[in-house]
């Protein structure tokens, strides 16, 4: 069983990471949607100094995100929001593809806006579910196919550095089919890093449907419930997770379950009963890896969260 945290300001100190390792953490994830590998030398130095054996980098891939904001935006229901030129930066491909009536989910679905109009340069939206929007948060358009490359230019640059930085695995978001995996494999080999393992993230319906097709090409599967939960009604997500788990288990391919495993521990020292039950069930369904994201990257209790993750998963294995 492997246990991963995500590095961020809340845990990027040698003492904190060491305590997380002592709690049972075996690997760390670095989210490159917030900055390139070359900008994180300080984090890499700490990771290697502590001796964390597994280092995963999470690429941007075909994922949609907003750009950098000068300051967080507080959005209220009914308020207008401009996405694109002259407003909140967002991918041009989305601006060109979205039509009035399209729902857009921000920050793993915490915020919801609806497209009211488009002028070719931006989308004029109305806030349906408000909240605070911060830089580089995820953006999803349920039911809309947005043309985007498997790997961005930034991804290719990060892959060139991956081997020298001690990366052991690459997480590819929003896998849509076998060609996405082949493209990543080619890029790794061209970078002289063909030994690095590929973790395919299932985050949309295309990935769910194509899983049997690309399963033989990957080293591990990641059931990433944040954006996957944006692609369907939330009440269908548990069934989808169990179905994906069964497919991976039958094929003998290791899989990981991630996103909001202990979300309440971003601000509370003790998890909810539902959260520990969720971890237990994921492991009982065959997950051989579980991961924390915001809980360790930005939460108030990164060490305690790792302790609960490890202890609950190990109890499920008894």
Model-assigned labels for residue ranges:
Residues 1-318:
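Non-catalytic helical/linker scaffolds that mediate oligomerization, partner binding
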């Amino acid at each position: 069983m492997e246990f991963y945290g995500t590095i961020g300001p809340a845990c990027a100190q040698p003492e904190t990471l060491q305590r997380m390792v002592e709690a049972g953490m075996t690997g760390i994830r670095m989210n490159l949607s917030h900055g390139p590998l070359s900008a994180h030398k300080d984090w890499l130095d700490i990771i290697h100094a502590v001796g964390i054996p597994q280092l995963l980098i999470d690429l941007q891939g075909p994922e949609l995100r907003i750009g950098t904001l000068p300051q967080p935006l507080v959005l209220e229901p009914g308020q207008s929001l401009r996405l694109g030129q002259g407003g909140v930066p967002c991918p041009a491909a989305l601006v060109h593809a979205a039509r009035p009536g399209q729902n857009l989910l921000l920050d793993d679905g915490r915020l919801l806006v609806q497209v009211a109009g488009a002028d070719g340069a931006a989308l004029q939206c109305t806030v349906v579910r408000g909240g605070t929007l911060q830089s580089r948060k995820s953006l999803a358009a349920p039911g809309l196919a947005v043309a985007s490359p498997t790997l961005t230019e930034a991804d290719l640059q990060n892959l060139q550095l991956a081997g020298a930085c001690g990366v052991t695995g690459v997480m590819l978001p929003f896998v849509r089919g076998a060609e996405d995996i082949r493209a990543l494999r080619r890029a790794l080999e061209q970078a002289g890093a063909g030994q690095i393992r590929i973790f395919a993230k299932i985050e949309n319906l295309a990935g769910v449907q194509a899983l049997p097709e690309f399963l033989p090409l990957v080293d591990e599967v990641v059931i990433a419930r944040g954006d996957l939960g944006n692609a369907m009604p939330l009440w269908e997500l548990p069934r989808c997770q169990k179905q994906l788990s069964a497919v991976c288990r039958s094929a003998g391919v290791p899989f990981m379950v991630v996103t909001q495993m202990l979300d309440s521990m971003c601000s509370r020292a003790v998890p909810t009963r539902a959260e520990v039950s969720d971890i237990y069930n994921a492991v009982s369904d065959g997950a051989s890896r579980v991961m924390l994201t915001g809980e360790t990257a930005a939460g108030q209790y990164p060490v305690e969260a790792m302790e609960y993750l490890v202890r609950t998963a190990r109890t499920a294995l008894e």
